[in-house]
Structure formats: C-alpha cells, structure tokens
A protein has these predicted regions:
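Recognition helices and adjacent regulatory flanks at domain boundaries
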Residues: 1-9, 46
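Short loop/turn motifs at secondary-structure junctions and domain boundaries
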Residues: 7, 73-74
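N-terminal amphipathic/basic helix or basic patch
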Residues: 8-11, 93
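N-terminal helix-turn-helix DNA-binding core of bacterial DNA-binding proteins
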Residues: 11-54, 75, 81
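Basic amphipathic alpha-helical segments that dock to polyanions
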Residues: 55, 59-62
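A short, conserved structural fragment
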Residues: 63-71
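Alpha-helical linker/hinge and terminal dimerization helices associated
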Residues: 65, 94-106
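Basic, amphipathic "hinge/linker" alpha-helix immediately C-terminal to the N-terminal HTH DNA-binding motif
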Residues: 74-97
Length: 109
C-alpha cells in the first residue's frame, strides 16, 4: 500500500480523490461493485477507449491502495480475477450517488 505519511492533505476530499480520482478508477470500481468478480479481459471490454497500459496501471494503483484484490490462479492459461476489498466496498455509497447524479443530469447535455 502507498504511504501517504509524507503528504499532507488540505482536506479528506483531496485524499479521497487521490485514491479514486481520474477518468477510469471510479468506473472500474463501479463495475466491480455491481458485477462482482471480473477478469482483466472483462474489465477491458467494459471500458471503451482504455488502453492496455492504462488499465494495467489503474488496476495496480487500486490494488496498492487496498481498494481491489487481485487473485492470480496458477494454471494454463493463466487466470487473474479482480474484486473489491472491504475497504473498496466502503466506496459503494459514493459511487451510487455519483451514478444517481449522472442519471439526473446527463439528459441536460
């Protein structure tokens, strides 16, 4: 897990956005929250426009921050599954509110 001791945050929102900010992290977390365990390829198909490099980076960061769990199965072909950790599950109400806000305001675009 990343060490945030050296970094001082002005407020808790800044810390939260450090962990889940950006274009892809909230969407990855949303799909894992709604669909449960997903394999890498399944996540990639859900995120139209994301590159392999970006998805790999985002998954590694979410895992390092303790928000998702990566389960690797040593078999042929290799199998890796991603799921929310207990800490990651605490973000579900926030993601649900973001979804609700988006549904209410998307039609105005």
């Amino acid at each position: 897990m990343k060490s945030f001791i050296a970094k001082q945050y002005a407020c808790p929102v800044e810390y939260t956005l450090t962990l889940i900010g950006g274009k892809w992290k909230p969407v990855i977390l949303w799909h894992l929250a709604n669909d449960g365990i997903k394999r890498y390829g399944e996540i990639k198909k859900l995120l139209i426009g994301i590159t392999h490099k970006m998805l790999s980076q985002q998954l590694k960061e979410l895992e390092a921050d303790g928000l998702i769990h990566r389960e690797e199965y040593h078999q042929i072909p290799p199998k890796v599954e991603y799921s929310l950790t207990d800490k990651g599950k605490t973000l579900i109400p926030i993601l649900q509110l973001m979804c609700q806000w988006g549904q209410e305001n998307m039609e105005h675009i």
